[in-house]
From Swiss-Prot:
Pfam families assigned: AAA_2 (PF07724), ClpB_D2-small (PF10431), zf-C4_ClpX (PF06689)
Source organism of this protein record: Yersinia enterocolitica serotype O:8 / biotype 1B (strain NCTC 13174 / 8081)
InterPro entries: AAA+_ATPase, ATP-dep_Clp_protease_ClpX, ATPase_AAA_core, Clp_ATPase_C, Clp_protease_ATP-bd_su_ClpX, ClpX_bact, P-loop_NTPase, Znf_CppX_C4
Function text: ATP-dependent specificity component of the Clp protease. It directs the protease to specific substrates. Can perform chaperone functions in the absence of ClpP.
Protein's name in the database: ATP-dependent Clp protease ATP-binding subunit ClpX
Start and end residues of each ClpX-type ZB domain: 2-56
Length: 423
C-alpha cells in the first residue's frame, strides 16, 4: 500500500479509477500496476451494498407466530379491546397459515378470511392493523374509502390501493402479495338509499361493487412505478387473493338498527316483556350482536358483506382505558413526549391528575384515543417553543391546571433558588 508517497522511480501516483493524485486523497492503495484511492473504495462499498439490498430476497419469518403470541404483542401497544384482539389474532394466523401451505390442504380449498372492524372513532382500529403488520414484518398500506370512486369517474380508482402497497415494498410483487391493506371509513360507502335511483351512486354502492373482486381475490394489473395506464404498457400482475384486507368503520347508527331487530317481536299487551331503563343495552353491547342483516340494512350490499366473514367489534374507550393508553404501551404518548424533551436534556413529568384531566377532555370531545395527542400538544406548545432558547432547565412538570389551560407547566432549574414557573 502506498500512502501519499512516490514510487521507486519518483513518479507521482494517481488513482486508476478517478484520476486523482496521491496528494488529493487520504490513502492510495497499490496493486499490480494499478492504484485505488480511499474515496473510490467507499464508493465501491456503497454500490455493492445497494446491489445486495436489491437482489436479496425477502426473508420470511422462520416460524409463524401463534395466536397467543400475536395477542401478547398487540397487548404491548393496544390497551383494552380484548375480544377484537382475539378475533384478529386467530384470523391473521389462519390467513398466513393458508399462504404458507398453499390454498389447499388435503384437497380441501381454504377460503380467504378478510376482516371487518366495527368501532367508534379513536377506539384503536387503525392501530391494531398497523401493529399486526409491523409484528409480522409485512408491507402495510392504508386507504380511505371516502376518496374512492368507480373506475372512469373523478376520484381514486380502487386499484390505486394495490399501487400504494407496491410502493411500500419498492414494487416487489412477491412482498406485496404477503401484505396487509387497511381500508378506513368503510361505513361511508354504504348505499345512500334502499330505493333504486336514476343517478348512479359512484361513491357508495358503486365502490362496494368495485372492491368486491379486489377483496375476494383477482389479478390486478398495476402500472409499474406509478405510471399512467396505456394499452402498450406492461403491467405488474398482483394476485390479491394473497393480500389480507381489513376494513374498518365507526358505523354510527348501526346500534339503533340492531336494537330495532332485537326489540322487534317483543310484542305488546299482556304477554309483552317490558324492559326497564337499567336493562337497556349499551352501544358496545349492541354492536357485539351485529348480524349480516343489520349491515345490509345499514347500507352494505350482501355480496360485500360476504367477502368480510370475520367481524370484530371494538368498544368506546373508558376514561381508565385512556389513562392507561397515555402511560402504559411501549410507545405511549407520555413516553414519546418525554423522549422528545430528553433530546433537550430536560426531564418531563406528568402528574397523575394531569393524565386524568387529559382523559376527561378526550371523553368530552368524543374523539377517543385519537384526540389525546392534540390535547397534550396544546398544553406543551409554548414550553416546546421556548425551551430550546432557555438555559439550565432540568425538569418540566405538567399538572391538572396546565391541561385546563389555567397555568403553564412548572419549570425546575438547575439552581434550587432559580425555580420559576414558565409563562
Amino acid at each position: 500500500m502506498t500512502d501519499k508517497r512516490k514510487d521507486g522511480s519518483g513518479k507521482l501516483l494517481y488513482c486508476s479509477f478517478c484520476g486523482k493524485s496521491q496528494h488529493e486523497v487520504r490513502k492510495l492503495i497499490a496493486g499490480p500496476s494499478v492504484y485505488i484511492c480511499d474515496e473510490c473504495v467507499d464508493l465501491c462499498n456503497d454500490i455493492i451494498r445497494e446491489e445486495i439490498k436489491e437482489v436479496a430476497p425477502h426473508r420470511e419469518r422462520s416460524s409463524l407466530p401463534t395466536p397467543h403470541e400475536i395477542r401478547r404483542h398487540l397487548d404491548d401497544y393496544v390497551i383494552g379491546q380484548e375480544p377484537a384482539k382475539k378475533v384478529l389474532a386467530v384470523a391473521v394466523y389462519n390467513h398466513y397459515k393458508r399462504l404458507r401451505n398453499g390454498d389447499t390442504s388435503n384437497g380441501i380449498e381454504l377460503g380467504k378470511s378478510n376482516i371487518l372492524l366495527i368501532g367508534p372513532t379513536g377506539s384503536g382500529k387503525t392501530l391494531l392493523a398497523e401493529t399486526l403488520a409491523r409484528f409480522l414484518d409485512v408491507p402495510f398500506t392504508m386507504a380511505d374509502a371516502t376518496t374512492l370512486t368507480e373506475a372512469g369517474y373523478v376520484g381514486e380508482d380502487v386499484e390505486n390501493i394495490i399501487q400504494k402497497l407496491l410502493q411500500k415494498c419498492d414494487y416487489d410483487v412477491q412482498k406485496a402479495q404477503r401484505g396487509i391493506v387497511y381500508i378506513d371509513e368503510i361505513d361511508k360507502i354504504s348505499r345512500k338509499s334502499d330505493n333504486p335511483s336514476i343517478t348512479r351512486d359512484v361513491s357508495g354502492e358503486g365502490v362496494q361493487q368495485a372492491l368486491l373482486k379486489l377483496i375476494e381475490g383477482t389479478i390486478a394489473a398495476v402500472p409499474p412505478q406509478g405510471g399512467r395506464k396505456h394499452p402498450q404498457q406492461e403491467f405488474l400482475q398482483v394476485d390479491t387473493s394473497k393480500i389480507l384486507f381489513i376494513c374498518g368503520g365507526a358505523f354510527a347508527g348501526l346500534d339503533k338498527v340492531i336494537g330495532q331487530r332485537i326489540n322487534t317481536g317483543s310484542g305488546i299487551g299482556f304477554g309483552a316483556t317490558v324492559k326497564g331503563k337499567s336493562e337497556k343495552a349499551t352501544e358496545g353491547e349492541l354492536l357485539r350482536q351485529a348480524e349480516p342483516e343489520d349491515l345490509i340494512k345499514f347500507g352494505l350490499i350482501p355480496e360485500f358483506i360476504g367477502r368480510l366473514p370475520v367481524v370484530a367489534t371494538l368498544s368506546e374507550l373508558s376514561e381508565d382505558a385512556l389513562i392507561q393508553i397515555l402511560k402504559e404501551p411501549k410507545n405511549a404518548l407520555t413516553k414519546q413526549y418525554q423522549a422528545l424533551f430528553n433530546l433537550e436534556g430536560v426531564e418531563l413529568e406528568f402528574r397523575d391528575e394531569a393524565l386524568t384531566a387529559i382523559a376527561k377532555k378526550a371523553m368530552a370531545r368524543k374523539t377517543g384515543a385519537r384526540g389525546l395527542r392534540s390535547i397534550v400538544e396544546g398544553a406543551l406548545l409554548d414550553t416546546m417553543y421556548d425551551l430550546p432558547s432557555m438555559e439550565s432547565v432540568e425538569k418540566v412538570v405538567v399538572d391538572e391546571s396546565v391541561i385546563a389551560g389555567q397555568s403553564a407547566p412548572m419549570l425546575i432549574y438547575g439552581q434550587p433558588e432559580a425555580q420559576a414557573s414558565g409563562e
